[in-house]
From Swiss-Prot:
Protein name, as recorded: Aspartyl/glutamyl-tRNA(Asn/Gln) amidotransferase subunit B
An annotated Gene Ontology molecular function: asparaginyl-tRNA synthase (glutamine-hydrolyzing) activity
Recorded name of the encoding gene: gatB
UniProt keywords, alphabetically: ATP-binding, Ligase, Nucleotide-binding, Protein biosynthesis
Family in the record: Belongs to the GatB/GatE family. GatB subfamily.
InterPro entries according to UniProt: Asn/Gln-tRNA_amidoTrfase_suB/E (IPR017959), Asn/Gln-tRNA_Trfase_suB/E_cat (IPR006075), Asn/Gln_amidotransferase (IPR018027), Asn/Gln_tRNA_amidoTrase-B-like (IPR003789), GatB (IPR004413), GatB_C_1 (IPR042114), GatB_Yqey_C_2 (IPR023168), Gln-tRNA_amidoTrfase_suB_CS (IPR017958)
Reactions catalysed, as given in the entry: L-glutamyl-tRNA(Gln) + L-glutamine + ATP + H2O = L-glutaminyl-tRNA(Gln) + L-glutamate + ADP + phosphate + H(+); L-aspartyl-tRNA(Asn) + L-glutamine + ATP + H2O = L-asparaginyl-tRNA(Asn) + L-glutamate + ADP + phosphate + 2 H(+)
HAMAP family for the chain: GatB
PANTHER family membership: GLUTAMYL-TRNA GLN AMIDOTRANSFERASE SUBUNIT B MITOCHONDRIAL AND PROKARYOTIC PET112-RELATED, GLUTAMYL-TRNA(GLN) AMIDOTRANSFERASE SUBUNIT B, MITOCHONDRIAL
PROSITE patterns xref list: GATB
Keyword Ligase: yes
SUPFAM superfamilies registered for this protein in UniProt: GatB/YqeY motif, Glutamine synthetase/guanido kinase
Length: 480
């Protein structure tokens, strides 16, 4: 029997506000343990939460970007549970009236087709702290993350393969990143994914028993974990077994999912309205103000790059994969840079440099201005493409102007015949054996002189001019 895969995803996104959702403490990632805390985060008696308006701004933007309806009568709820990283013994979240609901996002699949994935809801809430278990036998609680604002985005169970889940996450990350409300860095925990997966016979309307997957620390692992679960569950069902409702984690080492716990029923969190936060209204004017702050989204940019700039679909997809790269490209083209040349550099030498250095585009000294200037001096013959690679590395590490560096470093391309011809003659004089081979008619003997000439000029000879002059002087040499 063949089975249909049914997948839904729950994605927690950390919002990049300066302060936490209900306290004025810094929400910055990476500080020393328990330094980003105050009496509200520690839940001291008598302290009251104060809602950060910037969090609601971000929630509205996310809802608009994901084509969602917005609940304009806003309130928060208490989700009750006890855990050491949750001092209040409850989490302030949203239950029956999330900020956004009934949305969708269009994703592009590997075969080039598109699919619309429904989004059930998006709700605002506070993050919990972090437990760490030491080798000394003690466990420690770091409350820096306690109260950091989150938006949880819950998809409909519309995905029918791990590939579709991967495409959904890619599209969701792009949209959230472009809104500017989060950096969505999974390695820093600002985007976290839980997956729910079940199988059912084709044609059956009712969902099968679902398994929840955790410990999915990359999009690749989401896909691998889901692929493993499809095989595991299908094997159980084909053998006549029954799928238990479980929470499992993906283990990278064994490339399998491992049981964490069996779920016997839905947890009872005893939700009730948060009494310490007043109800408030999200006005039409507020929504429209947030709408005006939304950028052009990746799908629209891709279409424009193809239609107006003549780029291929592949190039457009690569350039818009991150907002940083796309904004850099936009700025370079606005400065007069040739779109195809800028695209080639960003996808070629720039991408290779970033991978080798383990950095992002905003962490190096390359700017749209100096990249465009460098491309211009390649096109006007000041430097060769080979020398340009050296110039680029300097700009990436040190910044500054491309032309200024080329002139100071003596990297200007040699194109003057009156300079090149004497160098060619010196090459002949320094390589008598090669000259003898050439004169005797040895096959491909002339090609050696190209390397000799480029070495003599330290790669600065204009290739087109140099090859023409070399051919001219070799012809004379043969006649002698």
């Amino acid at each position: 029997m063949n089975f249909e895969t049914v997948i839904g995803l729950e994605v927690h996104v950390e919002l990049n506000t300066n302060s936490k959702i209900f306290s004025p403490t810094s929400a910055h990632f990476g500080n020393e343990q328990n330094t980003n805390t105050n009496v509200i985060d520690w839940s001291f008696p008598g302290v009251l939460p104060v809602l950060n308006k910037g969090v609601v701004d971000a929630g509205i933007k996310a809802a608009l970007a994901l084509n969602m309806d917005i609940h304009q009568h806003m309130h928060f709820d208490r989700k009750n549970y006890f855990y050491p990283d949750n001092p209040k013994a409850y989490q302030i979240s949203q239950f029956d009236e999330p900020i956004g609901y009934n949305g969708w996002i269009e994703v592009q699949l590997e075969d080039g087709t598109t699919k619309k994935i429904g989004i059930e809801r998006a709700h605002l809430e506070e993050d919990a702290g972090k437990n760490t278990h030491g080798t000394d036998g003690f466990s420690y609680v770091d409350l820096n993350r306690q109260g950091v604002p989150l938006i949880e985005i819950v998809s409909e169970a519309d995905m029918r393969s791990p590939e579709e889940a991967y495409a959904y996450l890619t599209a969701l990350k792009e949209v959230i990143q472009y809104t500017g409300i989060s950096d969505v860095k999974m390695e820093e925990g600002s985007m976290r994914v839980d997956a729910n997966i079940s199988l059912r016979p084709y044609g059956q309307e009712e969902f099968g028993t679902k398994t929840e997957l955790k410990n999915l620390n990359s999009f690749s692992n989401v896909r691998k974990g889901l692929e493993y679960e499809v095989q595991r569950q299908a094997k159980i069902l084909r053998s006549g077994g029954v799928i238990r409702q479980e929470t499992r984690r993906y283990d990278e080492a064994s490339k399998s999912t491992i049981l964490m716990r069996v779920k016997e029923g839905a947890a009872d969190y005893r939700y009730f309205p948060e009494p310490d936060l007043p109800l408030f209204e999200i006005s039409d004017e507020w929504i429209e103000e947030m709408r005006t702050e939304l950028p052009e989204f990746p799908k629209d940019r891709r279409a424009r790059y193809v239609a107006e700039l003549g780029l291929s679909d592949y190039d457009a997809n690569q350039l818009t994969a991150t907002k940083v790269t796309s904004d850099f490209f936009e700025a370079a083209v606005a400065l007069g840079g040739d779109a195809k040349q800028v695209s080639n550099w960003l996808q070629g030498e720039v991408a290779q440099f970033l991978n080798a250095e383990g950095k992002t585009l905003e962490e190096i000294q390359l700017t749209p201005e100096n990249l465009v200037e460098m491309i211009a001096i390649i096109e006007d013959g000041t430097i060769s493409s080979k020398i340009a690679k050296k110039v680029f590395v300097h700009l990436a590490k040190n910044g500054g102007g491309a032309r200024e560096y080329v002139e100071k470093a003596g990297l200007v391309q040699i194109s003057d015949p009156e300079v090149l011809i004497p160098i060619i003659h010196q090459v002949f004089a320094d390589n008598e054996a090669a000259v003898a081979d050439f004169k005797s008619g040895k096959r491909n003997a002339d090609k050696a002189f190209t390397g000799f000439l480029m070495k003599a000029t330290k790669g600065q000879a204009n290739p087109q001019v140099a090859l023409k002059l070399l051919a001219q002087e070799l012809a004379k040499l043969k006649e002698d």
